[in-house]
Every structure is written in C-alpha cells, then in structure tokens.
Curated annotation (Swiss-Prot):
The cysteine framework is XI (C-C-CC-CC-C-C). Its main location: secreted. Expressed by the venom duct. This is Conotoxin Ca11a. One of its GO terms (cellular component) is extracellular region. InterPro entries: Conotoxin (IPR004214). One of its GO terms (molecular function) is toxin activity. Belongs to the conotoxin I3 superfamily. Disulfide bonds join 46-60, 53-65, 59-72, 64-79. It is found in: Secreted. Residues 20-42 form a propeptide.
Length: 80
C-alpha cells in the first residue's frame, strides 16, 4: 500500500513539473512570436536595388548600402 501511494505521489509530482515546463515553453514561444512579428518585413521593410538607404541593414538580402545617393547595390564582397 505504501509503495502504491509513493508511486502515485511521484507520478503527480512528475506531471506537475512537466506541466510547468510546458507553460514556460509556451511563454517563450509566444515571446519569440511577438518579437518576430515586430521585426517582420512589414515592420522593418528592406530596400531592393537602388533603394534609398543609410546603412546595410536597410537593404534586402545580399545587397549593400553605398550611401544615400547610390542606394542599395549588389556587392562583389560582403558588406563591411
């Protein structure tokens, strides 16, 4: 009888700890989704070729910013 009671208590504790981990993971996922939504292309649009830019992050993909007058361009080397 004591053995059965001990097993039941252990299983209850395991289910409680697993439930806490699942809720923590859910909170982490929702925070990640919120961050991704704020950093989505709609929130931070990038520019294509000849788009106005002031830094490399303003240009899409492998394009680099060559100043406000030149804009985003394809570079032979990685952006510096």
């Amino acid at each position: 009888m004591k053995l059965v009671l001990a097993i039941v208590v252990i299983l209850m504790l395991l289910s409680l700890s697993t439930g806490a981990e699942m809720s923590d993971n859910h909170a982490s996922r929702s925070a990640t989704a919120r961050r991704d939504r704020h950093l989505s292309p709609k929130a931070w649009p990038c520019g294509g070729v000849r788009a106005s830019c002031s830094r490399h992050d303003d240009c899409c993909g492998s394009l680099c910013c060559f100043g406000t007058s030149t804009g985003c361009r394809v570079a032979v080397r990685p952006c510096w």
